[in-house]
Amino acid sequence: VSERENLFSREIIMNQRDVSMSWEPDALHEECGVFGMYDFDGNDVASSIYYGLFALQHRGQESCGIAVSDTFGPRKVDMYKGMGLVNEVFDQEKIQSLKGNIGVGHVRYSTAGDSVISNAQPLVINYVKGTLMMAHNGNLINANELRDELAYTGAIFQTTIDSEVIAYLVARERIQSKTAEEAVVKAMKKLRGAYSLVVSSPRKLIGARDPYGFKPLCIGKRDNAYILASESCALDTIDAEFVRDVEPGEVVTIDANGIKSDKTLCMKPEEQARCIFEYIYFARPDSYFDGVSVYDSR
């Protein structure tokens, strides 16, 4: 992968040649991997995110990226993302250049839509409330409708992925909400589909799972740091302890005070639905989803 194909954050470069002007959602953009980490002691998290993404490589081989920020200093985002495998896009020098104790990472796989650098994640949105970093796994069935609604109110889209629709929706709701987690809950009320999200707003790491529980997301802990990951195998890679799964419909907020949960959108167990392909195809055999071993389920 050439350096020109990569995207180095401090100046986020959008190559308009890579951006489709027509909206073509990634209809089968479902097997991606997300990873987020917040180290309360101020240690850089890029290296741990790298290894977490490496463990999730089976979930996406087209592109990958890491975005980090420092909660103890100015809200400046360092990001690097590129086309290819995790170990192809990142080397030690690039990882060490990403300074920050909170961050999100993503590996992408799609069978429809554009496989270009502009569609690589994480996404970084700068808006009136600050900066939002987001990684998304899943697919929205009402992405066209939401995109049109946002576009008519002034949103300018730079990608062809439904993930950007979610990011703009969260940013818009944040302007009218007291907290970032409240904005995520409001945004989720408008989303239709299967998804898991990892969002970083100033000094908060937020994880969310669709109300049906179609896409997985779990919580881990290592020393004085918390982790959110698509699969438990990513926690094992960085010697983190598995805490629990994020419940379907739950929004988990991690900040200096620990973890808090919003279960406003949680559904009854009999109304929930899991993706069978996570157990028989997508996930690594050594992962666990909602207390079930992927290996045993196969």
In which residue ranges do the predicted regions lie?
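Conserved short alpha-helical segments that host acidic/polar catalytic motifs at enzyme active sites
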Residues: 4-248, 253-298
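Flexible, polar/acidic helix-loop-strand segments at domain edges
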Residues: 1
